[in-house]
């Protein structure tokens, strides 16, 4: 809806979807309980997608995920190019491409992710999120089991039950922790003969390499205990659904602040300093009519347009009548004898959270690190909300007061290859030449690369090799004179009333008594006492020095000196200027060097 609105109003738009096809979960929502204009919601959506594809100023990127959202609406998107291909097809092809996007406006519609349920032995093979089971059967025609039980605290699991039933899978029952509700989707499940255990909980699971049975008991009125007899139900798959958590990760990465909604225990986008909005279930709208109505109005207001394409839609949706959260479901066994897993990758449990609180940890960040909850590769997408709920209940505080852990990029993993980029051979780099470079060329010099500089190496005559040329040049320098083009050395102009004191601090030797017109060799160390750089510095006047550095270290030395002046000694009156390119430098050596210099500069007192 947002992409269509933007594109139809002549705004250049990029629509990014991490799936291979557009539409999300609604694309396979072929159910009497979800209709738009007397058509199944998925049929209506398919027509919308066809309209989208015809818009000229809309770029659609599928199999692409926004990995990071930085300041000033700068976004990084990872496009998967070959992960879906056969191993022979993907050979020698790029796996991922990294898109760098600078947007004027950003509309976040990242949806919500299903929560698990936390109960005893909930990490056995064959225990799967209810939405995953539905996706396997609807998208790919794959059955996760032949005898499936579903355990839920909301209506979403009933959609899964109906999809499974329509596909010929035996649905044992739906175990619902709520009191009986009469929403449209529940009534439809009952008409199909699907058995429902109301106000009940799974207290244990069995099975070695795969789940083979579950134990069900009734919940007490307050939901803190289980009562009555156990019911054993054989199954080879258990779907669990603990409600939905808005995906606010990208919003918070951009610097946005969250607010907490007590009604259904979710964190929602609140304040943002960027030109962005969040719409749909990532903004807390979970019902189909809510999503469409609020998305249209928010997008129109945000883009300052008036898209009335969706004004007269007739929407039928199954309204969820009751929502109930029990963060840690009770068991008929004492807490120390149960294994209610919280982080399914790091194997941290609800017991670990309670232990952390007994040990005195109160901050969610401290509990996270003590228990490793939320520190696996999913970065807490499945576990963090339950961890917050258990902490809040145990400590007797409100969830909204606890806050959240930090949402850090990337939202989805990136390969190093995507970050580095493609290999195109040698990259362009500038070439720096000294003022007498042309003279070196005329004298047939061979050059060496020193950083970005071309520095004369040696001057072969006729067919001399490097060794022969260097021997000849060295003998000439010892017997008569030699010159060296030292223009590549870094040069820093240092001025100010505290220039001498500054040099005393950055070099190992003293500079205050150096006479004007004289030079001195200086050795510079870093903080751990290792040699950092060296060079000759000349005193040009009372408060004026010219420092030389090594060729490769010039930029680093200047940066370090600037850092010292700004952070360590801001009281010093010193000004630094890079003058490496301002002056040519020639070193003259050998017994005849004075004679040569006196002819070049006759008035110079040597």
Residue ranges and their predicted role:
Residues 256, 345-347, 370, 393-397, ...:
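Glycine/proline-enriched, intrinsically flexible loops and inter-domain linkers
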Residues 1-433, 582:
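Residues forming the flavin
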């Amino acid at each position: 809806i947002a992409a269509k609105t933007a594109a139809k109003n002549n705004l250049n738009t990029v629509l990014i979807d991490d799936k291979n096809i557009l539409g999300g979960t609604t694309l396979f929502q072929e159910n009497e309980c979800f209709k738009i204009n007397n058509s199944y919601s998925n049929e209506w959506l398919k027509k919308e997608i066809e309209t989208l594809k015809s818009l000229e100023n809309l770029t659609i990127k599928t199999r692409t995920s926004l990995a990071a959202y930085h300041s000033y609406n700068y976004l990084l998107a990872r496009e998967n190019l070959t992960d879906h291909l056969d191993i022979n097809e993907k050979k020698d092809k790029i796996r991922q491409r990294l898109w760098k996007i600078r947007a004027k406006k950003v509309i976040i519609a990242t949806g919500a992710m299903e929560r698990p349920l936390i109960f005893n032995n909930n990490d056995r093979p064959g225990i799967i999120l209810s939405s995953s089971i539905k996706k396997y059967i609807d998208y790919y025609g794959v059955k996760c089991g032949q005898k499936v039980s579903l355990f839920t605290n909301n209506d979403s699991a009933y959609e899964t039950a109906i999809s499974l039933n329509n596909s010929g899978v035996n649905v044992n029952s739906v175990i619902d922790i709520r009191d009986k509700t009469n929403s449209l989707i529940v009534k439809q499940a009952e008409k199909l003969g699907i058995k429902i255990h109301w106000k009940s909980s799974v207290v244990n699971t069995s099975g070695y390499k795969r789940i083979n049975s579950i134990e069900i008991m009734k919940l007490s009125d307050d939901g803190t205990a289980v009562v009555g007899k156990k019911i054993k139900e054989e199954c080879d798959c258990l779907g669990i659904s603990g409600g939905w958590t808005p995906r606010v990760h990208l919003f918070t990465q951009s610097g946005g602040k969250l607010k907490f909604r007590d009604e259904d225990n979710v964190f929602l986008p609140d304040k943002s300093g960027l030109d962005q909005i969040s719409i749909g279930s990532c903004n807390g709208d979970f019902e189909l009519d809510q999503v469409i109505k609020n998305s249209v109005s928010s997008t129109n207001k945000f883009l300052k347009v008036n898209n009335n394409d969706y004004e007269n839609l007739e929407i039928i949706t199954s309204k969820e009548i009751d929502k109930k959260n029990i963060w840690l479901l009770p068991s008929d066994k004492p807490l120390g004898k149960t294994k209610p897993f919280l982080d399914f990758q790091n194997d941290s449990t609800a017991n670990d959270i309670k232990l952390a609180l007994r040990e005195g940890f109160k901050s969610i960040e401290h509990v996270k690190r003590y228990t490793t909850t939320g520190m696996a590769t999913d970065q807490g997408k499945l576990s963090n909300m339950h961890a917050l709920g258990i902490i809040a209940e145990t400590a007797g505080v409100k969830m909204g007061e606890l806050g959240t852990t930090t949402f850090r990029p990337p939202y989805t993993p990136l390969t190093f290859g995507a970050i580095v980029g493609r290999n195109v051979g040698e990259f362009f780099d500038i070439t720096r030449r000294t003022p007498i470079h042309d003279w070196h060329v005329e004298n047939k010099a061979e050059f060496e690369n020193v950083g970005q500089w071309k520095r004369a190496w040696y001057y072969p005559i006729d067919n001399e090799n490097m060794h022969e040329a260097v021997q000849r040049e060295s003998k000439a320098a010892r017997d008569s004179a030699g010159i060296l083009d030292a223009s590549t050395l870094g040069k820093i102009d240092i001025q100010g009333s505290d220039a001498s004191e500054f040099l005393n601090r950055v070099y190992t030797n003293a500079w205050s008594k150096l006479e004007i017109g004289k030079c001195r060799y200086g050795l510079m160390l870093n903080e751990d006492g290792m040699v950092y750089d060296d060079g000759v510095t000349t005193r040009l006047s009372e408060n004026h020095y010219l420092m030389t550095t090594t060729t490769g270290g010039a930029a680093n030395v200047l940066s370090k000196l600037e850092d010292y002046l700004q952070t360590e000694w801001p009281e010093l009156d010193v000004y630094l200027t890079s003058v490496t390119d301002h002056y040519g430098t020639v070193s003259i050596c050998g017994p005849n060097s004075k004679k040569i210099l006196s002819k070049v500069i006759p008035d110079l007192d040597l």
